[in-house]
């Protein structure tokens, strides 16, 4: 099958980490990496990079940045019920496919 993978989690969603060192923490998805089945979440799974001085980073030193988390370790947080929830898909009357919260049946997008 050609084309891009589809995930229940997208950019700018608020998610909660289900397993791992940041379990229970939540943040906003900055980027989804489809080829590796991972997502980068704001201020979660932080790593330290030792950088040499270069043209872009003149001073160098130790930088902290977000590291990708596997998509299976994330759960979407519903905006209405503010709980981590599973996501379903349904087709509206105007033939538009949308995501919905399985707990409160609220349309997410």
Curated annotation (Swiss-Prot):
Pfam families, per the entry: KOW, ribosomal_L24
Keyword rRNA-binding belongs to the record: yes
Keywords carried by this UniProt record: Ribonucleoprotein, Ribosomal protein, RNA-binding, rRNA-binding
GO cellular component, one term: ribonucleoprotein complex
One annotated GO biological process: translation
Source domain of life: Bacteria
PROSITE patterns tied to this protein: RIBOSOMAL_L24
Any GO molecular function: structural constituent of ribosome
Keyword rRNA-binding: yes
CDD domains the record matches: KOW_RPL26
Annotated family: Belongs to the universal ribosomal protein uL24 family.
Quaternary structure, from the entry: Part of the 50S ribosomal subunit.
The protein's role, per its UniProt record: One of two assembly initiator proteins, it binds directly to the 5'-end of the 23S rRNA, where it nucleates assembly of the 50S subunit. One of the proteins that surrounds the polypeptide exit tunnel on the outside of the subunit.
Protein's recorded name: Large ribosomal subunit protein uL24
Encoding gene, per UniProt annotation: rplX
